[in-house]
Amino acid sequence: MVSWIISRAVVLVFGLLYPAYASYKAVKTKNVRDYVRWMMYWIVFALFMTVETFTDIFIAWFPFYYEIKMAFVVWLLSPYTRGASLLYRKCIHPTLSLKEKEIDSYIIQAKERSYESFVNIGRKGLNIAASAAVQAATKGQGALVGRLRSFSMQDLRALPDDTPIHYTDALYPDEPQLHRRPMGFPTTSQADSDSMDERWSDSEIAETRTAARTRGGMPSKSLQRSQSLRVSKKKGLSREVSTKTTKPRAKKKPAQSEPEN
């Protein structure tokens, strides 16, 4: 554990931080020789980090593994040994020059395939989004039709007044059912009637009953009053007739006989 911590510290300080600062100085001074030196170092160190990823998994049990790794990093960086320049010129540069065309062709194929795969993934994503939008539109249309049907006259006629309406929203089926009375329905309950025709017949019967009551009730007083007026008129006429009949008739004077001569 201690050797692992020390090796990680050596790799970070001598393998990354110091070469990064030296590369900054080379860029600042614009020294071509330093450019070449540190470019070779970074190529070798990149390969070292790639190999280290696998060796830490499979060869970490090897004795003095971390010590060998620390010594290798110092050997690459030391200005006396110049291990990075040696490895690059003896091994890396000849290998890359031989395999350069194959590597370039692989890179081009990878770019083309990645572009094609990206386009295919984009098309699939657009198709999925379009299908989801269509499904959402159909669900919304179904919910709208359901709400309009809840306010249609046929459904309102089919339901009695005393029973509440249980309406479920198509978009939110898990919500509790809504209890409400449709617009335009009276609040009074009509338990005996089952259809609008029966209700209209009941209303007509009620109107006839009220008309009969009015005939037998309040209008009878008006009839009595009219009858009393007629009776009073008849009485007045009889009185006039009686007064006319009771007037004394003027007696006719007897005709005087002429004197006889």
UniProtKB/Swiss-Prot annotation:
Pfam families: TB2_DP1_HVA22. The chain crosses the membrane at residues 1-21, 35-55. It is a multi-pass membrane protein. It is found in: Endoplasmic reticulum membrane. Residues 167-261 are annotated as: Disordered. Disulfide bonds: none annotated. GO terms for biological process: cell division; endoplasmic reticulum tubular network organization; mitotic nuclear membrane reassembly; nuclear envelope organization. It comes from the Eukaryota. The keyword tRNA processing does not apply. GO terms for cellular component: cytoplasmic microtubule; endoplasmic reticulum; endoplasmic reticulum membrane; endoplasmic reticulum tubular network. GO terms for molecular function: microtubule binding. The keyword Oxidoreductase does not apply. Keywords: Cell cycle, Cell division, Endoplasmic reticulum, Membrane, Microtubule, Mitosis, Transmembrane, Transmembrane helix. Inactivation in embryos by antisense morpholino causes paralysis and shortening of the body axis. Microtubule-binding protein required to ensure proper cell division and nuclear envelope reassembly by sequestering the endoplasmic reticulum away from chromosomes during mitosis. Probably acts by clearing the endoplasmic reticulum membrane from metaphase chromosomes. May play a role in the maintenance of both the nervous system and the musculature. Belongs to the DP1 family. Interacts with microtubules. This is Receptor expression-enhancing protein 4.
